[in-house]
Regions:
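Short Gly/charged-rich anion-binding patches and loops
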Residues: 17, 93-94, 244-245
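N-terminal short leaders/motifs
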Residues: 70-81, 110-125, 129-131, 156-183
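Extended, compositionally biased flexible segments
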Residues: 56-116
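Hydrophobic/aromatic-rich core segments of domains that either
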Residues: 92-161
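Non-catalytic peripheral regions of nucleotide-handling enzymes
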Residues: 2-26, 138, 211-217, 248-285
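Secondary-structure boundary elements
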Residues: 9-82
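Acidic/His-leaning functional-site neighborhoods
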Residues: 148-149, 159-259
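Residues in well-ordered beta-strands of folded domains
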Residues: 41, 50, 106, 122, ...
């Protein structure tokens, strides 16, 4: 991964990733205009949020640098295997594609339950700024303005509210409930800072669970380990898919059973290591 992603798209494989992306989706639009941005972001939302590939890379990479999946690998992974990535790889990839297409964009960090564990992009265009968040499946650019903005999705209404000091809060609205999801800080972060947070994300608790999510015309699919939730206009349906996990993920996400099985095996070994008694110590409590 080259250090020049945000000012030299060739350093980050941006041009090559863009060619693969355009060949797969053929989004409408021409130059760096708002409608083109919407088309690219909408097409890119087909890539699912999933940490299967990240889990596999965590346990198989030869070095910390090798575990970061670059833009070509992310797009090629979707074309070949219907995989996607987590917020860092999805953001890095989309940022490089947009930069290579002539858009001015930079990475930003967001706070969830912990600081700086989520990320997104800010795109600048015609004296306006837009939040683009491929890791939260919003599916379209959202203008960063002085007034709150609401976006309708198939599973909830997403609301972005200005706060203070270059911060915006993102909520989801379902029925009468408003849930805070994160606070995004729109000040640009350096390439080095972005990569550092990306590397640190491999140690987050979420990496101890298989997580997948994507939007469909019917609603929102969410998998955590062997629990599947489908959330749509008619409500929620929960299902335990432990007995046919690999088959169901293949059916719902198109991801090959071998990929799910490999991630599952790595986590199973990790959990067995937690239960194993320390060397030289009795196993009983």
């Amino acid at each position: 991964l080259g250090p020049g992603i945000w000012n030299d798209p060739f350093a980050s494989e941006g041009a090559a990733a863009r060619e693969i992306f355009l060949a797969r989706f053929s989004p409408a639009g021409g130059g760096p205009a708002l409608e083109t941005l919407r088309c690219i972001v909408s097409s890119y939302a087909n890539l699912p949020y999933e940490n299967l590939t990240k889990i596999i890379r965590k346990f198989t990479a030869r070095s910390p640098e090798d575990r970061l999946r670059g833009p070509v690998e992310v797009v090629r992974g979707y074309v070949d295997d219907n995989t996607g990535g987590t917020c860092f790889s999805l953001t890095y990839c989309l940022g490089s594609i947009l930069a290579s297409a002539g858009f001015r964009c930079h990475p930003v960090m967001a706070d969830m339950k912990q600081p700086n564990i989520h990320c997104a992009l800010v795109v600048e265009m015609d004296a306006r700024r837009y939040l683009v968040d491929p890791g939260y499946l919003v599916g379209e650019p959202v203008e960063l303005g002085a007034a709150p903005v609401r976006i309708e999705t198939t599973f909830a209404v997403v609301e972005l509210r200005p706060r203070h000091g270059e911060r915006w809060d993102l909520f989801t609205l379902e029925g009468g409930d408003r849930k805070w999801r994160y606070t995004v800080k729109t000040t640009p972060v350096s390439h080095e800072t972005f990569i550092r947070h990306w590397q640190e994300s491999f140690s987050l608790p979420m990496m101890n669970n298989m997580l997948l999510t994507r939007l469909t015309p019917q609603g929102h699919l969410y998998v955590k380990n062997h629990h599947l939730r489908v959330k749509g206009p008619q409500g929620k349906v929960n299902e335990n898919i432990r007995g046919d996990l690999e088959t169901r993920i293949a059916a719902e996400f198109g991801i090959a059973p071998a990929i799910t099985a490999q991630a599952r095996e790595h986590l199973d070994r990790l959990r067995r290591s937690w239960r194993a008694p320390a060397a030289g110590r009795p196993g009983g409590g």
